[in-house]
């Protein structure tokens, strides 16, 4: 029973880390990265779909993204979606592909991005702690039902805490790595 609770909590914690990595991947760090466009949705014949499912996205140069749509008539729609996004990029449409030049980050922009990264990391840590609390509450509920002894509850809570500490350490490393990437000139 405790093992199931701990396993479930660990899976939720890993999902939180995966979401954090994906969110940080969409933040521009002065270098072109196709994952920056992951959140962009386009109107594909009446239904919204991710840009990556309607076009090939590549990075031929360190600061350039090239978007080649599967169908040429999507160029205008892709351009519109990029302009509406919060990325602050200006697409250049040449009739068959769209180029996005990623501007150099100013010192102020870098500092703002680092703040965003720290905030996102802190939100992930709060989510992890919430998962820990839920797992501990479930373990304590088993004790109230008479299914567990005090020692089993203590061991279960210790195991949950160890998993929590390991995941928070991973999150801290991810945040530090992203900060270094942003601040690298």
UniProtKB/Swiss-Prot annotation:
GO terms for molecular function: ribosomal large subunit binding. It comes from the Bacteria. InterPro entries: Ribosome_recyc_fac, Ribosome_recyc_fac_dom, RRF_sf. One of its GO terms (cellular component) is cytoplasm. GO terms for biological process: translational termination. Keywords: Cytoplasm, Protein biosynthesis. Belongs to the RRF family. Responsible for the release of ribosomes from messenger RNA at the termination of protein biosynthesis. May increase the efficiency of translation by recycling ribosomes from one round of translation to another. This is Ribosome-recycling factor. It comes from Clostridium botulinum (strain Eklund 17B / Type B). The gene is frr.
